[in-house]
């Protein structure tokens, strides 16, 4: 089938781009323009007509990319037209009337590029990450992965395992032949090197995933401490309802922020207190779960009635900031215990010391987001395959004696397969759907 879709964002725009890919792309161009194919990769102005008529849809630029030298590896074209809904719909309708043409699924153009060997799986994922990047650090990470450094590293490790696997399988195929001592030593040396490399890659504090998904901040504290007001201030908009009535927030309210280029997901949670209301109790449990899974906790308490004990005190650690709100109403010094914790006195209502709090948050972000060229993991599936590969290699080393070569070879094959799954070197059909469904239609 030949596929087509709008590749630019929906809505009114000066220019819209409709992509077409497949063996009937030539026919689509000829039928819509009533003219010969444009020169390869040369922007050509053409009148675009409704199918089988001379009624003009629009006048626009056509680009023709013969396969395999195209994004998808197939014959491909782009129609650059005026970006009104009526023009786009008319062009889509005309293409749909051509035999063997259908609307593309989400991410199908990039899926074709992967299947036709134009890109590896890591690059496909990095394209999706670049499209959805909201902050500078997310853009930088997506570009780094797109440039192939991660793929090169994983491919290099896989090739090392393939090399020693060939020696192990040679021993299995020719059991009467003894492997030279230097080859046996080399097998152990290389497998140990790969193990150390994988351990180093995994020891990254999950920075890559944090950058991609966002640094998680949970605002937690007793009722009416000003948690929702703080969320609204950080967001510069009214995200949460603010009320004098205690227990207004029952569910978790999340908002995505960009703080100095760092992606952040801030969660406002239900107030912590003893409650007999079943719905409120569930909200409090959600709040504590968010706190447990957060990268940073903002523990907000009311300066008028400082109640810092029990659960809230237990939550204080190196990943927490004690935020004492309504500090303009504080009529006594803080006790020495509270002063020992990292804290800040603020008043959301009077805009007091909020910049100090934001500065502390930024410092926490910078410490969490210490990036380096060694960050290679950006998704949970990368980490899972590396961990599984590592476990297989450990099993391999335990069996790395001549009499166990049959079993050892299987461990080595599995370790190699898991590394291949990361870049798509082996059959990965079962994960393609989850990856490419995250794309927009037209990409």
Swiss-Prot record:
- Which residues are involved in binding K(+)? 224, 243, 245, 248
Hydrolase in keyword set: yes
Instruction: Recite the UniProt keywords alphabetically.
Output: Cytoplasm, GTP-binding, Hydrolase, Magnesium, Metal-binding, Nucleotide-binding, Potassium, tRNA processing
Q: Which cofactor does it need?
A: K(+)
Q: What is its main location?
A: cytoplasm
Assigned EC number: 3.6.-.-
**Pfam families per the UniProt record, alphabetical:** MMR_HSR1 (PF01926), MnmE_helical (PF12631), TrmE_N (PF10396)
User: What subcellular locations does the record give?
Assistant: Cytoplasm
Q: Which SUPFAM superfamilies match?
A: P-loop containing nucleoside triphosphate hydrolases, TrmE connector domain
An example GO CC term for this entry is: cytoplasm
Chain residues that bind GTP:
224-229, 243-249, 268-271
Q: Which GO terms describe its biological process?
A: tRNA methylation; tRNA wobble uridine modification
A GO MF term: GTPase activity
Q: What is written in the cofactor note of this entry?
A: Binds 1 potassium ion per subunit.
Q: Where does (6S)-5-formyl-5,6,7,8-tetrahydrofolate bind?
A: 19, 78, 118, 443
Q: Which domain of life is it from?
A: Bacteria
Residues of the TrmE-type G domain:
214-366
Binding-site residues for Mg(2+), renumbered to this chain: 228, 249
InterPro entries attached here?
A: G_TrmE, GTP-bd, GTP-bd_TrmE_N, GTPase_MnmE, MnmE_dom2, MnmE_helical, P-loop_NTPase, Small_GTP-bd
Binding partners and assembly: Homodimer. Heterotetramer of two MnmE and two MnmG subunits.
What's the family?
Belongs to the TRAFAC class TrmE-Era-EngA-EngB-Septin-like GTPase superfamily. TrmE GTPase family.
Describe the task this protein carries out.
Answer: Exhibits a very high intrinsic GTPase hydrolysis rate. Involved in the addition of a carboxymethylaminomethyl (cmnm) group at the wobble position (U34) of certain tRNAs, forming tRNA-cmnm(5)s(2)U34.
- This one is known as tRNA modification GTPase MnmE
Q: Which source organism does the UniProt entry give?
A: Pelagibacter ubique (strain HTCC1062)
């Amino acid at each position: 089938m030949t596929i087509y879709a709008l590749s630019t964002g929906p809505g009114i725009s000066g220019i819209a781009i409709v992509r077409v890919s497949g063996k009937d792309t030539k026919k689509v161009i000829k039928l819509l323009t009533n003219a010969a194919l444009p020169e390869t990769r040369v922007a050509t102005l053409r009148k675009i007509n409704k199918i089988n008529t001379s009624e003009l849809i629009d006048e626009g630029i056509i680009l023709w990319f013969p396969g395999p030298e195209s994004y998808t590896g197939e014959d491909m074209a782009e129609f650059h037209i005026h970006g009104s809904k009526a023009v786009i719909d008319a062009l889509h309708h005309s293409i749909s009337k051509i035999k063997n043409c259908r609307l593309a699924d989400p991410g199908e153009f990039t899926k074709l590029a992967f299947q036709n060997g134009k890109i590896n799986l890591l690059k496909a994922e990095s394209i999706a990450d670049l499209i959805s990047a909201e902050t500078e650090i997310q853009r930088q990470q997506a570009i780094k992965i797109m440039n192939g450094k991660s793929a090169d590293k994983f491919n290099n490790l896989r090739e090392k395992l393939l090399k020693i696997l060939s020696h192990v399988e040679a021993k299995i195929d020719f059991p009467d032949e003894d492997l030279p001592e230097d080859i046996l030593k080399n097998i152990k040396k290389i497998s140990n090197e790969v193990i150390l490399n994988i351990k180093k890659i995994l020891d990254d504090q999950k920075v890559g995933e944090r950058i991609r998904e966002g640094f998680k901040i949970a605002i937690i504290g007793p009722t009416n401490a000003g948690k929702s007001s703080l969320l609204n201030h950080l967001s510069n908009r009214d995200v949460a309802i603010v009320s004098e009535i205690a227990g207004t927030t029952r569910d978790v309210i999340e908002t995505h922020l960009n703080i100095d280029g760092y992606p952040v997901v801030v969660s406002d949670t239900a107030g912590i207190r003893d409650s007999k209301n079943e719905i409120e109790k569930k909200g409090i449990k959600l709040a504590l779960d968010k706190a447990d899974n957060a990268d940073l906790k903002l523990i907000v308490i009311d300066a008028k009635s400082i109640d810092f004990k029990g659960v809230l005190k237990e939550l204080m650690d190196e990943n927490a900031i004690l935020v004492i709100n309504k500090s303009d109403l504080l009529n006594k010094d803080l006790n020495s215990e509270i002063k020992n914790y990292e804290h800040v006195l603020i008043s959301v209502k009077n805009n007091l010391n909020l910049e100090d709090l934001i500065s502390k948050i930024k410092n926490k972000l910078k410490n969490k987001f210490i990036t380096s060229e060694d960050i290679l993991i950006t998704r949970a599936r990368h980490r899972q395959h590396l961990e599984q590969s590592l476990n297989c290699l450990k099993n391999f080393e335990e069996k790395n004696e001549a009499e166990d070569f049959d079993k050892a070879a299987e461990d080595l094959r599995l370790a190699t397969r898991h590394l291949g799954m990361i870049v798509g070197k082996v059959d990965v059909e079962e994960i393609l759907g989850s990856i490419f469904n995250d794309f927009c239609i037209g990409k």
